[in-house]
Amino acid sequence: MAKTIAYDEEARRGLERGLNALADAVKVTLGPKGRNVVLEKKWGAPTITNDGVSIAKEIELEDPYEKIGAELVKEVAKKTDDVAGDGTTTATVLAQALVREGLRNVAAGANPLGLKRGIEKAVEKVTETLLKSAKEVETKDQIAATAAISAGDQSIGDLIAEAMDKVGNEGVITVEESNTFGLQLELTEGMRFDKGYISGYFVTDAERQEAVLEDPFILLVSSKVSTVKDLLPLLEKVIQAGKPLLIIAEDVEGEALSTLVVNKIRGTFKSVAVKAPGFGDRRKAMLQDMAILTGGQVISEEVGLSLESADISLLGKARKVVVTKDETTIVEGAGDSDAIAGRVAQIRTEIENSDSDYDREKLQERLAKLAGGVAVIKAGAATEVELKERKHRIEDAVRNAKAAVEEGIVAGGGVALLHAIPALDELKLEGDEATGANIVRVALEAPLKQIAFNGGLEPGVVAEKVRNSPAGTGLNAATGEYEDLLKAGVADPVKVTRSALQNAASIAGLFLTTEAVVADKPEKAAAPAGDPTGGMGGMDF
């Protein structure tokens, strides 16, 4: 495909036009009085959202240079969303301000590399200041306030705070669509995984279609169980102990399954067989998690243990096990708390070292099952369009609340960034680097000014008033009052604020140091087929 090339100012201005087109669509959503954006979908109903990254993903521009500029800013929003779960609109507004001021200085003759170094040093200083000023999140109310700011709804904030209170900071909180109107919270005690009983004959509660085992032994096997002679010695010992048995194995089939079912129907012995979750190495790891949680051991040839020689001491224990056709829940496993803590620490290390989003997500799920629990928020709404928008807001708010617990909170509403400006005076920079720091100084006011503008206030007046206020005091755009924002519950996770700034600065540096842009040349649409003489081709008169 043929390429088109732009140089110098033409290249940079083309990229900036694309950035502005995207940023102008995104920034109208910033703050409590921000508006929504309607996104047309090729199929189905349109989506209504105020989420920066969702809007950014939908924008495709026609001009090749503008398209590249927009793609670069999409990367800012996506990276911020990946790291912090929120702050995508703030990141876009900061990127726009940094690029605008930066290009103005480049056009005036400043060295782009000097500006880039100055911007990087200034951002590092501001990040350090933000982290120092962050307050730890200690109360349920603080979590609720932070989540409510993200979702724009206090009831959502309260529900997320309750969910985190129940499952712990490491617990998994998932959001599901509900057929009923409103919000509901469902909690899962202990470890739950998505595998149910192998045979319906194991059911103990016909009405609920559940198999419930009280105080059972738990047999964990890494291979298939098919012959009854392998299982019999252990079964006899369990029957003598007078307890039910849960078997979790790669599969239970043939004679072994028949024997268990027949004994269950006759009332001789209560048991349930379940397939182990996952595949390959992940299955082995999850079985090991269950072994540590229940105080048992995985029967595996790899560690020199076989089923026929297994002893009752290798079995795990739990207070209760509930098995449905789709899932199994182990409540209060009898594992050693130190061993569980060690396993949790090991999984945390694996999460930090993993560079795959999918692996990280699966490790996080394992961590939650061991360390906390699982909470499901069920969201309902009057229409499908509203339901999707609400679900998305709740998911963002959950990640926001977790980010707040992780690194602490700072004053929201763009105030923390503006109040970090004096820290730049400590930098002793000269020449173009000093100019780069001044670009950051101007850009740090942009989020507050945009929030004020969206709230119908004069941005310059608001910025001046906040600049002269004590640290942490600023505009509460929801009420129009100037107050201590942390006390008023207007807080942002510092992780969100710093990620937005760092990612915006990264892309701004690329914009400023760009000297040429190579893009695909737009193809001209082919003329419709027809008779070149103007008649109807192929017709005979």
From Swiss-Prot:
Q: Which family does it belong to?
A: Belongs to the chaperonin (HSP60) family.
Where is the major localization of this protein? secreted
Q: Which GO terms describe its biological process?
A: protein refolding
Binding-site residues for ATP, renumbered to this chain: 29-32, 86-90, 413, 476-478, 492
Stored CDD domains: GroEL
List the SUPFAM superfamilies hit by this protein, alphabetically: GroEL apical domain-like, GroEL equatorial domain-like, GroEL-intermediate domain like
**Record GO terms (molecular function):** ATP binding; ATP-dependent protein folding chaperone; isomerase activity; unfolded protein binding
Q: Does the keyword Nucleotide-binding apply?
A: yes
Quaternary structure?
Forms a cylinder of 14 subunits composed of two heptameric rings stacked back-to-back. Interacts with the co-chaperonin GroES.
What GO CC terms are in its UniProt record? capsule; cell surface; cytoplasm; extracellular region
Name the encoding gene, please.
Answer: groEL2
Listed EC numbers = 5.6.1.7
Q: What does this protein do?
A: Together with its co-chaperonin GroES, plays an essential role in assisting protein folding. The GroEL-GroES system forms a nano-cage that allows encapsulation of the non-native substrate proteins and provides a physical environment optimized to promote and accelerate protein folding.
Catalytic activities? ATP + H2O + a folded polypeptide = ADP + phosphate + an unfolded polypeptide
Q: What is this protein called?
A: Chaperonin GroEL 2
Keywords on record: ATP-binding, Cell wall, Chaperone, Isomerase, Nucleotide-binding, Secreted
Its localization reads: Secreted, Capsule; Cell surface; Secreted, Cell wall
